[in-house]
Amino acid sequence: MDKYAVFGNPIKHSKSPFIHTLFARQTMQDLEYSAIEAPINGFVESVTAFFSQQGKGCNVTVPFKEEAFQFADQLTERAKLAGAVNTLKKLDDGIILGDNTDGEGLVQDLLQYQVPLEDKHILLIGAGGAARGVILPLLKQNPASITLVNRTYEKAKQLAELFSPYGRIEAKEMSDINKGFDVIINSTSASLSGELPQIDPVIFSGGAISYDMMYGSGKTIFNQWALENDAYQAYDGLGMLVGQAAESFTVWRGLRPGSKQILRELRKNLEGM
């Protein structure tokens, strides 16, 4: 039986084993998937041991995505630009391939909700690893523009410059934003601590689509704020979690599993039904 895993610290609350076990059942793939808590200073040793014991592939979550980027022998284009790896695969020749499926997970979730991206004006809040991982897949959808904002403007500016060869992207100061956008994506973890970005809620005017990468049992504080300020619809990041998992599964097995049923199951669990 082929072995897969997710590495993180902490990891016990990870939903990845649940998701990938259902994917395997759905696609009739014979595999096992476990959660491995690597020591904070012991990721490389843990993942090396996993691959030496017939491990075929793994997911990597916080705080090890940058270490996984360094660990991989070979990187996909999207992983190189993301500067982080959330998916490792052992190729037939023993080479370890590093990939990043986060951005594809986001895009697939938005498209599943029939959120149009082509020729749309997108506002991306945050300039950390989560934002960096989704910019290339978003640009590949040919939006009219992506505007990046961040508490530290300089960080947003550096990201915009990095991705400018791939499409229309610019950085702005939060205080300079004074108009509505078609799609607003919050890539920060502020919702988890009940905080909102210091930006004018005019961004939602005219019926914008709001997307918060965080998720919980109810609407996130960011999405509540969006709906109170004229957003047309608001989605959380649970579907992105399932979408990036589906993309990882496809990288490993060459088969794309369906996500809708698993997303429903996860939502039920979250809401305590």
Swiss-Prot record:
SUPFAM superfamilies: Aminoacid dehydrogenase-like, N-terminal domain (SSF53223), NAD(P)-binding Rossmann-fold domains (SSF51735)
Keyword Acetylation: no
Binding-site residues for NADP(+), renumbered to this chain: 77, 126-130, 150-155, 213, 237
Pathway recorded for this protein: Metabolic intermediate biosynthesis; chorismate biosynthesis; chorismate from D-erythrose 4-phosphate and phosphoenolpyruvate: step 4/7
Enzyme class: oxidoreductase
Cellular component, GO, one term: cytosol
Keywords, alphabetical: Amino-acid biosynthesis, Aromatic amino acid biosynthesis, NADP, Oxidoreductase
GO MF: NADP binding; shikimate 3-dehydrogenase (NADP+) activity
One Pfam family from the record: SDH_C
InterPro entries, per the entry: Aminoacid_DH-like_N_sf (IPR046346), NAD(P)-bd_dom_sf (IPR036291), SDH_C (IPR041121), Shikimate_DH (IPR011342), Shikimate_DH-bd_N (IPR013708), Shikimate_DH_fam (IPR022893), Shikm_DH/Glu-tRNA_Rdtase (IPR006151)
Catalytic residues in the record: 65 (proton acceptor)
Keyword Signal among record annotations: no
Binding site for shikimate: 14-16, 61, 86, 102, 215
One GO term (biological process): chorismate biosynthetic process
Catalysed reactions, semicolon-separated: shikimate + NADP(+) = 3-dehydroshikimate + NADPH + H(+)
Domain of life according to the entry: Bacteria
Enzyme Commission number(s): 1.1.1.25
Family per similarity comment: Belongs to the shikimate dehydrogenase family.
NCBIfam families listed in its UniProt record: aroE, PRK00258.1-2
PANTHER family (UniProt xref): BIFUNCTIONAL 3-DEHYDROQUINATE DEHYDRATASE_SHIKIMATE DEHYDROGENASE, CHLOROPLASTIC, SHIKIMATE DEHYDROGENASE
Quaternary organization: Homodimer.
Purpose: Involved in the biosynthesis of the chorismate, which leads to the biosynthesis of aromatic amino acids. Catalyzes the reversible NADPH linked reduction of 3-dehydroshikimate (DHSA) to yield shikimate (SA).
Name this polypeptide is given: Shikimate dehydrogenase (NADP(+))
Source organism per UniProt: Aliivibrio fischeri (strain MJ11)
